[in-house]
């Protein structure tokens, strides 16, 4: 028997995922002594003494059987002679020392686990019907964290001191809720209230059951959740969905739906093995699936009526679906007969989602009938992530947010020691910060042509800088376009910190992103076809659809689509008839073109006419996306 001492340093997603209790239980079962320590922003340290074979077994178990929601990026091991200083194995108090060169991996929000779902529906459970139940393996993380290390005082659960019973489990290393920072119960935790759109509190012995009844009756309800707020209504009838569209002034954009369970989803549509794996993962994103493949094959009444499906995703062959990921979702489906609920973000189109109860109720009273809101602060809002499979095997992000943020991407190259902020483009923006060879992306922000979204971007970036312990970044980058609000925002940050500002050509940014995503070595050059829309070119002209040759640092434009003359500037991006006129105006007889366009609009209340066709101004813009839209528009007009 050979006794040894081992010091193990583990980095990755090892905080807020039950990693320390896991190590504690294994070490105790192997009769090892020592400790496991949360290093705050630098991973977890494990120091153990005991038989060498038992220590090897501990390391093997950590590598191969750690909690499913954890992720080990590095495991460094140092052997030494035992010092016989430990009587037992303990979980030590987290370190509060911040290391400027540390590589923190911050935990995303995690869907409710099966054990907590059982607690939710088991009558003898202390958490029976409690809509905020969680444990060390599940529940909100990123949306509640205010600082590191990830301990309860550094979350919004600071507002809810634990009762004696909850504290007993919280301090017991063998309990599933040991150091579960968001744990609580009916007696000590957050609570919901139900209010109508006139501000009247709805009294009920079970307000969640009452909310489900209201939805069954066709009501539209705002429901505050883990990291944001949804507007919900039923799917068994298309009328409430059409009412929601009318009130939200969202005539065509699709809604997402939350399906009761996996078996119900499989009655609605066919999903492959990978789609099922993603849908049921602890990340629980929205997945775009075929809208009709299930119903077309069913000889029985479809799970969701065809009229409702068309109202949910008008004119589309796919639909965004997700499964319940929070306790409140399971409780709502427990009390409703609906197979699915429409869930759309609680915000006006193009604006950040509302997360404060009073703002939710003030701003949405003309859209919703009732509000189900709670008193736990959401420190960082995050929309539902959206994933789509390409070729049935390759999942790609349409939107990266809840469940994935703030996990970093690896980034190798001579710049990996630099701390750089990226503020993103104008459309579908996401901020990012590089540190220690990682790129930490913020949650999805949206279009930054609104000042409210710039404020959201600023808040998200500042929060990430704080968590990463970056007091002064080395540089900041923005889009080359001089008139974007995000460009102005970057200029202000550069001036505030007195750091360089780098203006990046939009399509070169796409090229560099492909290299990062593919882990292509930094000294490589690639040929990249950017089948993208408008980008401000290095020659101060509009670019779109380039063939670029380049690397991380720069690129050369070797070719691209022929410049097309689009009418009315940015209105061509809204009214396809304008761009079609720009392309075909000099190539087609006027009468034939007018016949093709029919009653198409070129402005909110203006249809195409011969006179208008004669006077439309032409503004040059090269844009591959508009060209594809024009082709689609012609195909639509000809059918």
PLM-predicted stretches and their roles:
Residues 266-271, 331, 353-362, 384-385, ...:
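Conserved phosphate-binding catalytic cores of ATP/NTP-utilizing and phosphoryl-transfer enzymes
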């Amino acid at each position: 028997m050979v006794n040894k001492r081992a010091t193990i340093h583990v980095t990755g997603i090892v905080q807020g995922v039950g990693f320390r209790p896991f190590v504690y239980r294994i070490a105790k079962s192997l009769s090892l002594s020592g400790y496991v320590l949360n290093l705050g922003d630098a991973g977890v340290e494990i120091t153990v003494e005991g038989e060498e074979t038992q220590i090897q077994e501990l390391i093997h178990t950590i590598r191969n059987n750690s909690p499913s929601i954890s992720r080990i990026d590095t495991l460094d091991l140092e052997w030494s002679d035992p010092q016989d200083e430990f009587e037992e194995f303990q979980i030590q108090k987290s370190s509060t020392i911040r290391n400027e060169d540390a590589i923190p991996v911050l935990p995303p929000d995690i869907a409710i686990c099966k054990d907590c779902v059982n607690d939710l529906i088991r009558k003898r459970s202390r958490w029976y019907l409690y809509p905020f139940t969680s444990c060390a393996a599940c529940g909100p993380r990123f949306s509640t964290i205010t600082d590191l290390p990830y301990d309860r005082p550094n979350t919004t659960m600071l507002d809810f001191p634990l009762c004696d019973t909850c504290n007993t489990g919280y301090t017991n290393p063998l309990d599933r809720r040991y150091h579960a920072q968001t744990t609580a119960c009916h007696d000590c935790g957050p609570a919901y209230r139900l209010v109508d759109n006139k501000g009247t509190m709805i009294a009920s012995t079970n307000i969640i059951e009452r909310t489900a009844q209201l939805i069954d009756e066709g009501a539209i309800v705002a429901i505050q959740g883990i990291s944001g707020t949804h507007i919900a209504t039923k799917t068994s009838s298309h009328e409430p969905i059409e009412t929601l569209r009318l009130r939200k002034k969202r005539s065509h954009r699709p809604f997402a739906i939350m399906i009761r369970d996996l078996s119900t989803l499989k009655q609605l549509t066919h999903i492959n093995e990978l789609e099922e794996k993603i849908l049921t993962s602890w990340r629980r994103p929205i997945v775009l699936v075929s809208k009709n493949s299930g119903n077309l094959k069913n000889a029985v009444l479809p799970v969701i009526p065809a009229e409702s499906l068309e109202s949910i995703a008008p004119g589309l062959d796919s639909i965004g679906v997700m499964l319940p990921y929070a306790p409140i979702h399971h409780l709502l489906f427990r009390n409703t007969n609906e197979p699915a609920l429409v869930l759309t973000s609680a915000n006006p189109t193009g604006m950040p989602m509302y997360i404060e109860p009073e703002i939710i109720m003030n701003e949405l009273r003309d859209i919703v009938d009732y509000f189900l809101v709670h008193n736990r602060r959401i420190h960082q809002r995050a929309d539902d992530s959206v994933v789509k499979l390409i070729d049935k095997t390759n999942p790609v992000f349409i939107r990266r947010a809840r469940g994935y943020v703030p996990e970093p991407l690896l980034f190798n190259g001579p710049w990996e020691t630099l701390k750089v902020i990226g503020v993103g483009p104008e459309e579908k923006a996401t901020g990012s910060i590089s540190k220690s060879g990682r790129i930490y992306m913020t949650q999805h922000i949206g279009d930054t042509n609104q000042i409210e979204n710039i404020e959201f971007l600023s808040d998200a970036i500042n929060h990430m800088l704080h968590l990463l312990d970056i007091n002064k970044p080395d540089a900041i980058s923005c889009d080359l376009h001089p008139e974007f609000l995000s460009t102005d925002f970057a200029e202000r940050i550069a001036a505030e910190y007195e750091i360089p500002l780098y203006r990046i050509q939009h399509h070169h940014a796409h090229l560099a992103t492909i290299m990062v995503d593919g882990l292509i070595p930094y000294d490589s050059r690639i040929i990249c076809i950017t089948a993208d829309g408008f980008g401000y070119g290095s020659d101060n002209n509009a670019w779109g659809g380039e063939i670029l040759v380049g690397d991380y640092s720069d690129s050369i434009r070797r070719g691209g689509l022929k410049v097309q003359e689009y009418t009315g500037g940015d209105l061509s991006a809204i009214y396809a008839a304008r761009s079609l006129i720009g392309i075909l105006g000099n190539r087609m007889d006027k009468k034939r073109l007018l016949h093709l366009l029919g009653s198409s609009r070129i402005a909110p209340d203006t249809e195409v006419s011969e006179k208008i066709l004669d006077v439309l101004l032409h503004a040059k813009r090269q844009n591959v996306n508009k060209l594809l839209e024009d082709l689609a528009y012609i195909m639509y007009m000809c059918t």
